[in-house]
Amino acid sequence: RNLLSVAYKNVVGARRASWRIISSIEQKEESRGNEDHVSVIRDYRSRIEKELSDNCDGILKLLDTKLVPAASSGDSKVFYLKMKGDYHRYLAEFKTGAQRKEAAESTLTAYKAAQDIANAELAPTHPIRLGLALNFSVFYYEILNSPDRACNLAKQAFVEAIAELDTLGEDSYKDSTLIMQLLRDNLTLWTSDMQDEAADEITEEAAKQQKAVNNNKIAY
């Protein structure tokens, strides 16, 4: 189970990283007006997206037809449903329009199904339950653009795990505490971003009000 997950994660992870780099370069070249460069970069990006789609579709088919139906224990069900959500999320990262909407909806469905089982059958400190909370919160933040829900989910998972930290066995202590640290890091980052955005909005609103005052003065 873990070997399969790591194998696909390595293959898809490398292409996700390449896609991010290429997309960044494409934006820079577009801003500079280098259309010849942009055309070549787009072709390369399309090839990466094709490989990503094929890889994600391959593991999703395996999950739907074999792995999820055959899962019997609670942790196996959560593991494979989380995995299903992950690969739909990877598709949502680069798909557009109706395809992106479909991938996002499939991600949400898989994560929610996994969450229901995890909450009922796995301890708050279980690394698979924590990993699900981590990835689910990232989905809310990055794909659905919902920082409030992302922060609430991550915070709840972290607080619930902290409350039962003394029940952790040695075998899962390292994995669980590592994921908890990632949850806390994301919370710190996202909260900071939200505060920056709020400050920008306040500054913008103040500028508008000042402009209105100035306009009134001019009118008088």
Swiss-Prot record:
One of its GO terms (cellular component) is cytoplasm. Pfam families: 14-3-3. GO terms for biological process: protein localization; signal transduction. It comes from the Eukaryota. It comes from Spinacia oleracea (Spinach). SMART domains: 14_3_3 (SM00101). InterPro entries: 14-3-3 (IPR000308), 14-3-3_CS (IPR023409), 14-3-3_dom_sf (IPR036815), 14-3-3_domain (IPR023410). This is 14-3-3-like protein. Belongs to the 14-3-3 family. PANTHER family: 14-3-3 PROTEIN (PTHR18860).
